[in-house]
Design a protein with these regions (language model features):
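Anionic-ligand anchoring segments at beta-strand to alpha-helix junctions in alpha/beta enzyme folds, i.e.
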Residues: 116-183
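Conserved thiamine diphosphate
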Residues: 26-65, 183-184
């Protein structure tokens, strides 16, 4: 679940020697194919001289942008070879430039929708914890005077005794929070993963 929960995780797996990869060798596994859909990035280390750089890149990719799991596959001959223990100072990966800048047009549109709504409601997920945005989320809801509900992963972002906090939603949530979602005319989802489970066709 590290991918869905945006958990920065670096995994190391063992592999047969590089000259045996792709030959259906005993104990060989197509780890790239197995993990492609559940990992943020998968790297097969082919040369010992690339190992330190790739380890540095793996940790960088795992914790930047949308955090997630990264896997390094280490062939037997690469692990057996001696090499330098120095790591590069900086990481520069061509084609990987996480966008962390806010989109001012989208922010303005969201603010207009909030001001026009009669019963707006914030739904905050665990991404707020990962981003370290607890203080900012509390300040935003207090400034706008908009109530908040959370997902299970988002529990703890808002103090449970806060007057604007209704609790967490869903099957394991409470009645007040679930009813608030049903009654709101604008649901502002922040930093969460939306489930593909079937929903009530009467809702929009």
């Amino acid at each position: 679940t590290a991918n869905y929960d945006s958990v920065p995780l670096v995994c190391f797996t063992g592999q047969v020697a590089t000259n045996l990869i792709g030959n259906d060798t005993f104990q060989e596994i197509d780890i790239v194919g197995v993990t492609r859909n559940i990992a943020k990035f998968v790297i097969v280390v082919r040369k010992r001289e690339d190992l330190n750089r790739l380890i540095k890149e793996a940790f960088y990719i795992a914790r930047t942008g949308k955090p997630g799991p990264v896997l390094l596959d280490l062939p037997k001959d690469v692990m057996a070879e001696l090499g330098s223990d120095e790591y590069p100072e900086e990481v520069n990966i061509r084609g990987y430039k996480p966008n962390t800048k806010p989109h001012h047009g989208q922010i303005l549109r969201a603010m207009n929708m909030i001001y026009d709504a009669k019963r707006p409601l914030f739904l905050i997920g665990g991404g707020a914890k990962i981003a370290g945005a607890q203080e900012e989320m509390c300040k935003l809801m207090e400034t706008l005077k908009v109530p908040v509900v959370t997902t299970i992963m988002g529990r703890g972002i808002v103090p449970t005794n806060h007057e604007l906090y209704y609790g967490n939603i869903g099957m394991h949530g409470n009645y007040a929070a679930n009813q608030a979602v049903n009654d709101c005319d604008l649901l502002i989802s922040c930093l969460l993963y939306t489930s593909p489970r079937p929903r009530d066709p009467k809702t929009s």
